[in-house]
Amino acid sequence: MSQALDYAKRLIAAPSVTPATGAVFDEMQAMLEPLGFAVHRFTRGEGEEGSDEAPVENLFAIRHGPEGSKHFAFAGHLDVVPPGEGWTSAPFEPEERGELLYGRGAVDMKGAIACMVDAVANVPQEAGTISFIITGDEEGPALHGTRALIDYMRSEGIKPDLCLVGEPTSVNRLGDMMKIGRRGSVNIWLEVEGTQGHVAYPHLAGNPLPAMVEILRELNNLPLDEGTDWFQPSNLEITEIDVPNRAHNVIPAKAKARISIRFNDTHSGASLSKQVIEIAEKHGGTARPVISGEPFLTEPGAFSSMIAAAVKAETAIDPEPSTTGGTSDARFLRSVCPVIEFGLCNATMHKRDEAVAMADLDTLSRIYARVAQAALSS
């Protein structure tokens, strides 16, 4: 059994549905300390289980190189989404079948973290400083995870030169895509207050629905942009409409809706929120925005070339630089240093029978080792 495969099995076998704490971090620590890493673990969040403030465990590990050497960071998350029903094997009992390893987190992203650990075993300490930024809160609210790790790093004066996040970016085969950026995301809750009444006496009531319809119509037709060189066009989607009204003959007292905007770097979360608030207020409504991330772009250059060269050397293919897809914790790490995402094939992430090709684990480990070596010698 390869070392990367063994590490992946150990991590998968430690259940860690978001927010993650405990055993899976014990495994991670047990893997890193024999490789010379100093491991610091801490918990943030003091709320009840199931709430956004539920406790989250985080891990920062560092192996110092010579004084003045470069610092390269690996980042990722050990929490996983709930497994759901219908698996053909137990989701937290890793199982080899044919060429695949099955288990929740196999590709998102315990498999990639296993490859990172295996990779650093093949990078000599004298090459430079390597760290791990690992959270148990990426699949959930992401309030007490990577943000808290960044706060810790800043308090300790720790600043990597480059960071690679192990999200499953590959599409059809390992190495065909890396993420050099991501669009931003803002969710906005809309509300219009009315006056409840009988439908036969509309003059004694105030129907909030026509105003909500006008708000949503204007938002749905709002021109955003046509995209940029690296980003697809921004899009606004109506994701929820709700009227707490179960009777057919009652004019409701309130109408609620929610929209979600994924936006490129021609906007900011604040600028879009301002537009939506103005439209809502024009029609007598209110808007409450929650910005979950700003767009970021690590423009193609030295870092992306390092990754491309490593992928080419191990797979003979050229990875496509892309900014498609959802948000990740790279949106927080961008404030620390240049960051790029690269990892396993994503076809089975968040699905039942999540699985990774075992050969890909060894290949990804070698790619990560090449990237780390190149980053530390740059």
Swiss-Prot record:
Binding site for Zn(2+) 2: 108, 139, 350
Active site: 79, 138
Co-factor: note: Binds 2 Zn(2+) or Co(2+) ions per subunit.
GO process terms (BP): diaminopimelate biosynthetic process; L-arginine biosynthetic process; lysine biosynthetic process via diaminopimelate
Enzyme class: hydrolase
EC number of this enzyme: 3.5.1.18
Catalytic activity: N-succinyl-(2S,6S)-2,6-diaminopimelate + H2O = (2S,6S)-2,6-diaminopimelate + succinate
Cofactor(s) recorded in Swiss-Prot or TrEMBL: Zn(2+); Co(2+)
This protein's UniProt keywords: Amino-acid biosynthesis, Cobalt, Diaminopimelate biosynthesis, Hydrolase, Lysine biosynthesis, Metal-binding, Zinc
Pathways per UniProt: Amino-acid biosynthesis; L-lysine biosynthesis via DAP pathway; LL-2,6-diaminopimelate from (S)-tetrahydrodipicolinate (succinylase route): step 3/3
Residues annotated to bind Zn(2+) 1: 77, 108, 167
GO molecular function, one term: zinc ion binding
InterPro entries for this protein: ArgE/DapE_CS (IPR001261), Bact_exopeptidase_dim_dom (IPR036264), DapE_proteobac (IPR005941), Peptidase_M20 (IPR002933), Peptidase_M20_dimer (IPR011650), Peptidase_M20A (IPR050072)
PANTHER family xrefs: ACETYLORNITHINE DEACETYLASE (PTHR43808), N-ACETYL-L-CITRULLINE DEACETYLASE (PTHR43808:SF31)
Record's subunit section: Homodimer.
Functional summary from the UniProt entry: Catalyzes the hydrolysis of N-succinyl-L,L-diaminopimelic acid (SDAP), forming succinate and LL-2,6-diaminopimelate (DAP), an intermediate involved in the bacterial biosynthesis of lysine and meso-diaminopimelic acid, an essential component of bacterial cell walls.
Family: Belongs to the peptidase M20A family. DapE subfamily.
Cited HAMAP family: DapE
Protein name (Swiss-Prot/TrEMBL): Succinyl-diaminopimelate desuccinylase
